[in-house]
Design a protein with these regions (language model features):
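Cross-family detector of peptidyl-prolyl cis-trans isomerase
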Residues: 1-144
């Protein structure tokens, strides 16, 4: 396969992913907005705590699903983690999404594959080149 073929295949896959995201939003909730980084978000609760920034240690509880409606993780099963924002402990898309929240906030984020788990998936539930949907249920800043 030539470099040109690979580039064309990636372009086609990216267009298909955009179409699938647009269809999901049209069917489920048209209040999502697109971020400058090209993921989609809906802030459900602003939160009253501190604005989050890179370097903050946070504890998050989330549901992680796919566009087909399947749920991969819940707080009871791998959907609860402590991370440092800016280190990409989970993935770049979620890392950037968390910067949109305040402590105590809640939001839903549709993260395209290239900002989520990419070509390799997460080696568990999320397959290769899959768009993921994070529903952040709670986020709290951890003060060392």
């Amino acid at each position: 396969m030539t470099k040109e073929n690979l580039l064309e295949m990636n372009r086609v896959l990216a267009e298909l992913e955009k179409k699938n995201i647009a269809e999901y939003i049209a069917k489920t909730d048209t209040s999502f907005r697109q971020s400058p980084l090209a993921f989609w978000y809906k802030i459900e609760r602003e939160g009253k705590g501190a604005t989050l920034k890179r370097g903050d240690n946070v504890h998050i509880r989330f549901n992680l699903g796919l566009l087909d409606g399947s749920i991969c993780y819940t707080p009871e099963h791998k959907g609860e983690q402590t991370i440092t924002i800016g280190r990409y402990d989970i993935n770049r898309g979620l890392d950037e999404a968390l910067l949109m929240l305040r402590e105590g906030g809640r939001g839903k984020f549709i993260i395209p594959a290239d900002l989520a788990f990419g070509i390799v998936g997460d080696q568990d539930c999320v397959g290769s080149k899959r768009t993921v949907i994070y529903e952040i249920i709670s986020i709290e800043k951890i003060i060392p």
